[in-house]
Structures are given as C-alpha cells and as structure tokens.
C-alpha cells in the first residue's frame, strides 16, 4: 500500500507514490495527459490492489474543496470532475496504481491557499516541533521556581489536588472545570510536557483562577493565591532567555565534558595497535553513555552559604548562656507536662484543616512555639529580646483571634503566666552583662566545634529508652515509697511515746507544784513579820500589780490584811524568791553550822527562848518584843 503524506494543519493534500509496475506508470502518464485541458486539479491515491481508492483531493481553481474517503464495494460520484463509478464491476478485478491529475500550468506545485498557508513536508514539521520544545536551562529554572513556591507558607492549600470528599465540598467541580495544583505543574515539568514558558504560566494562572472562582476574591485563601502568584512572577522575571549567548553555551558544553570525564570509569588501555585502542575507547564511551544516566552536579547556592554565615553561633559566651536558658524555658512551655495548655501553640495554625477561613485576615504575622524553637536551635536570634518578641507575638495572636472566655484564650493566659514565672526565676542569668573578656577567640572554629556541647546540653533524660535502666528506675521509685511509709510509721510511734511521757511529767509537775505552793504560802505566813519596811513595801507593790483594779486591800494604820489564796501561783513564787528564799537558805546554813560549833547553838537557844518569851507577852508590848527579836536576829547574823 502506497503512502499519502498530508499536512493536516494547513489542510493541503499531496500525493507521493511510487509506481508499482510498468503498467501503472503508463496509466499514470495517460491519465495525466487526458486531464491536461481540465481546469480542476484532482489528486487520486489508490493504495489497494483490489481497486479501492483510499483518498481523492480536488482543487477547483485556486480553492480547496473537499477530501473524500472511499470504502470497499461502494459507488461514489465526483460531480466537479465528471468521474463516476470508480469501483464498478468492470474495474473490480483490475490493479489500479496511484494516479495524479494536475493542471498543466502548475504541474509541480500546488496553488496558493487563500489564507496564506504554505505547504510543508514532514521533516519541516519535525524541525519545528524540536524548536518549540522548552530548553533544558529554562525547564530547570522553572522547576526550581515551582519548588521554591511550594516551600512558602501561603502555598499549603495548593500543594496537592483538591479532594472534594475529604473537604466536604461536593459542588467543587461545578465551579472548577480544569483542576490544577503545584504538584501537577512540577510533574509536568519533570516529564518535559511543556513546550513553552507560556504554558507553565497558563497552568499557574488556571490554578489561581480556580481558587478565586470557588472562594471569591475577598477570601483569605484567594489572598494566599495572589501572593504566591506574585512570588512566582517575580521568579519568572529573572529567568534566563530561551537562547543562551555563545559564551554560556561554550561554558555549558565544557561543564558537560567535565561531568562525562568524572562519570566515566577508569579505562586501562593496551598499547598493541592504534586500531585496537580506538575501538576500545569508543566501545567504553558508548557503554558508559548507554549503561547508566549521567549525574548532574549542582553547585551550592549563594543563599545557602549566606544563611550559614548569618546563622552562625554568637561570639559572646554570656549570650550563648542566655540563649540556652531561653531554650530551657521554651522546653518547659512545650513539655508534655503542660500539654493541656500548650497544644494549640506547638505548630503553625492551618486555617483549612481547622476551618478558619478568616484567620489570616485577623492575624497578619503568624507565629508558633515550634518556629521559635527552630529559630533558637539554628541561632537565628541575635538578642534575647527577639525571642521574647516572638513569644509575645504568639500570645498576642491568640488573644486577638480568640475572644475572652474562649478556651484557647484561657490556655494562652495560663501559658503566658507560666512563661513569666520561669522568666523571673532566671533573671540572674538573663540580666548578666556581656563583656569583651567572654568573647570566643576563634569564631569560625567555635561555630562548629561548640555545637556538640550545645547538643549535649539539649539531651534530656526522657530520651533514654534502655529497658534495663527503666526497670531499675521503677524499682527505685517503689523502694522510695516503701521507705517513706516506714519512716512515717516510726515517727508516729515516737510521737505517741513522747506524748505519753510528757503527759506523765505534766501530771507529776502539777502535783509537785500543788504541794510546793502550799509550802510557799506557809513559809511566807510564818516569816512575813521578819521583813523590813522597805521589803514590805516592795511585796505590797507586787501584790497590787498582780490583783485586778477592783480588788482593794483592806488596811488599817498599822496592819494590812492579805489573803494569799486570791494570789496566783506566779505571784506567790515571785514574792518567795525575792524576799523569803534567802532567809530560808540562811536558816539552813545555821542548822548545818550548829553541828560543828557550840557558840551559835547557844545564841540560837537564847534567841528561841527569847522568841518564846516574846510569845507570852501580851498584845500591848508586841512592838517592844518585835524590836528585841529583831535585835537578837541581828546579833545572830553577826
């Protein structure tokens, strides 16, 4: 069967066929001469030995009219050319070859199309298609731009295709006829589906338009879509041109050769002959290029190097100590112990998952504890004030979006109180003044070597997962509980015994005091007349101070009546200690000294006798006897 090449895009038909036999050649020439006087151009292609015409094209003057397809065992009429019944019974068993009937004035070319379309051959089409493919350097740049766009916070709703079932939006496809997302654009770029930059931007615009049509132009998701579109357009403004300059092409080819040399295996050649060397060399190169893909080497980006330099460890040891303290405080806020109040603030807020479409309308600067922890670990803060500002921003966003009385609002208040408590607790470290002496000598070495120390301090005991250690810890806890119980039991026993002893001593003391107070009263009554006037006045003053105001002592000019029963025990003891105790001690000394000397005993006997005589004297001579007794007592003391 012969081949008919047709340019389907420009609607021109052309017949290219080779004669199959000498008979076919003669028929072709005869038919072309017969139709030389005809005004119409007829191209007939026959590709079947059974007499079936595959295609016929008719050009009536300068205009293209129609293309007819003929089937088996059917009769067709061509009104413009006067050809009828091509597949009649008389020609059913004839072998027809391709026939070309053209105008005599233009035997080698087709007439010009009224729309200005020109005839093109298949090699020209292939060349044009190759020229329309996206250059590798532009494809690579677009792919990196899409990946950078996916890393934005605003790009989260556009990373994956929209799932109407999971998001409970069954009417999504009523508004969106052509779904599009960033992952699909990235996949198409990796598969070399795009042939121009405009196709990529068109898909990106389709994704943004879908968002605006479904969510409305004033929605927070729509504003996120506009922001990532602005970012992507900014990336496109720095895209390299489609055709690189000659210097860039030479540099690219040089890099490719260098990569090929690096990827090619080591070849040991034998110096047998020049022919063998060439064969072996070409064979090895073909094997390497066809065996495995070449690895592309990507140079590090200047931005990454800038980040490494910018986020280096601070020189000041005091500042490092402050940041470690901040990290410890942050770990307390993020610990499982406080999970009942910290879980809404651990990760960035997802408005889609939490069904909060107006979140970014209220919160302009989102912040969370996880981001703050990452910034601390990577030394992104230069001062502790930046850390405090970000932490206060978390609480501010919470109070701004959640009204007072909301559960999340109360959680934020409790978490802020906890932070303030630990912050005040570590004021000694946080208020240390930085000096020049605590600067590290070599910043470059310290920024890498001291990271290990920082990591060691961050190790927590909760990270230990050894079962033997965990078993021993549990056993120690049980033993500590048992030890505390035993201590409590022993202390209760000791306290009971001590109370019992103290109670017995108290009862004995009370009994002894009862007897001793009676003895004191008796001794005071017996020796009250032995006091001098000065001592008597002091004793009366003590008694008056101890009595209440309404109690008045009954007194005459010469005598004062005192009832000792109305005095308390403390007053009686005080009177006795001040005025009568010394006298009793002196009397006891006299008794002891009387055992060894005879003179005092004689005096004592005389005194006693004198006192006995004085007792017989009547009341009228009482004062004289008192003076005599006082004189006798003075002589005894001498």
Curated annotation (Swiss-Prot):
Residues 450-460, 624-638 have a biased composition (Acidic residues). GO terms for molecular function: core promoter sequence-specific DNA binding; histone binding; histone reader activity; lysine-acetylated histone binding; TFIID-class transcription factor complex binding. It is found in: Cytoplasm; Nucleus. Residues 468-537 form a coiled coil. Phosphorylated by the casein kinase CK2 complex. One of its GO terms (biological process) is negative regulation of heterochromatin formation. Residues 1-54, 250-306, 435-460, 586-638 are annotated as: Disordered. InterPro entries: Bromo_chromatin_reader, Bromodomain, Bromodomain-like_sf, Bromodomain_CS, NET_dom, NET_sf. Present with 2930 molecules/cell in log phase SD medium. Belongs to the BET family. Transcription factor involved in the expression of a broad class of genes including snRNAs. Required for sporulation and DNA-damage repair. Prevents the spreading of SIR silencing at telomeres and protects histone H4, but not H3, from deacetylation. Interacts with the TFIID subunit TAF7 and with histone H4. This is Bromodomain-containing factor 2. It comes from Saccharomyces cerevisiae (strain ATCC 204508 / S288c). The gene is BDF2.
